[in-house]
Amino acid sequence: KLIDKKKNTAKVAFNSDLQKIYSTVTQKSFTAAETLIKNLIDFGRSIRLILDTYFPIVARRLGDHWVSDKLTFAEVTLALANLQLLNSKFEPLYLSGLKSSQIRSKILLVVPTGEDHTFGAISVARKLRSMGTQTILLLDYQNKELEDLILGETLDLIGISSGNNFMTEKINALSTFLTSRIGKKTPIALGGNLV
């Protein structure tokens, strides 16, 4: 659902919308970016289009522009922080418009220590919550925290999110750490650009 049909709509100018979001988050003004998102919603863009399509494309573009030296690491970090703040600000609106299932699965999403790509995991956590799951997102953790969590909770799935090829050894070690504590009773899945 790209357009909210209950609102007066303007023609969706996909590339223009993306450029406006990109520009506002890179200008380090959260207030301007928040106003832009509200305006896009007022003009009929659905929150699903914005959070599920626009934000991931903008995040990828920011990463590409860092790799190609069009933006500095600091500029990308600040822009992604703005994007993540927008994501958390508008997530309640996103979740309010979706019907949750009757299944109340409990899922743990782990972003391995050292992984610097977190936007995908945050987006996946939002999507899973919208489906009625109880989703725990674990970032920048200590092994003791992770161990206490997996031993203290009944989990239906553990997801590992990674976007870096250099994380293979850490992911294997994390998987071994998890299975040595929970056995094979809880499935472990890997997702992200690495896959």
Provide a role label for each language-model segment.
Residues T113, H117-T118, L137-K144, E169-K170:
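A general structural motif
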Residues K1-L95:
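Long amphipathic alpha-helical segments
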Residues S105-L108, I158:
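Conserved hydrophobic helix-helix packing surfaces used for dimerization/oligomerization
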